[in-house]
UniProtKB/Swiss-Prot annotation:
Domain UPAR/Ly6: 31-106
Residues of the signal peptide: 1-26
Protein topology in the membrane: Lipid-anchor; GPI-anchor
Propeptide: 107-131
Main location class: membrane
Protein known as: Protein Bouncer
Expression tissues: Expressed in oocytes. Not expressed in testis.
InterPro entries assigned: LY6_UPA_recep-like, Snake_toxin-like_sf, SPACA4/Bouncer
UniProt family annotation: Belongs to the SPACA4/bouncer family.
Species assigned in the record: Oryzias latipes
Lipid sites, type GPI-anchor amidated asparagine: N106
Localisation: Cell membrane
Keywords: Cell membrane, Disulfide bond, Fertilization, Glycoprotein, GPI-anchor, Lipoprotein, Membrane, Signal
């Protein structure tokens, strides 16, 4: 019984050490890309690799109080959190950008890296409990 418990703890510790390795070894950040589109238009997100010194962003275009446009991709950190005007099909939208600096962080549903790691660890730990 003790040996099985020790082995399970060892596997859990190993998992906690191995999960962050890919994040630490990657040179450039991987993000999702989509062009500036009307919010209602669905677009299959494309994975892109950002150039050095760029971060993932998610941009929203507003017309008055209505969020009408969205975009994703890479941008320089100095350009993050900025707001500017964009003219599209004769309408002027106010584009605002929010940036993040971990892989695939600009997807539609926000999921923090620590949360993802904890969920993965819980799944693995439960699989050991069932065996």
């Amino acid at each position: 019984m003790g040996s099985l418990r020790t082995r399970q703890l060892f596997h859990a510790a190993l998992l906690w050490l191995c999960l962050p390795l890919p994040l630490l070894l990657c040179e450039n950040l991987h993000c999702y890309y989509s062009p500036v589109l009307e919010k209602e238009i669905t677009f299959e997100l494309v994975v892109t690799e950002c150039p050095p010194n760029e971060m993932c962003f998610k941009g929203l275009g507003r017309y008055g109080n209505y969020t009408a446009l969205s975009a994703r991709g890479c941008m320089l950190e100095k350009d993050c959190s900025q707001v500017h005007s964009l003219r599209l099909l004769g309408t002027v939208y106010t584009m605002s950008y929010s940036c993040c600096d971990w892989p695939y962080c600009n997807r539609a549903v926000a999921l923090e890296p620590l949360t993802a790691m904890l969920v993965a660890a819980a799944v693995v730990a439960c699989s050991f409990c069932l065996t």
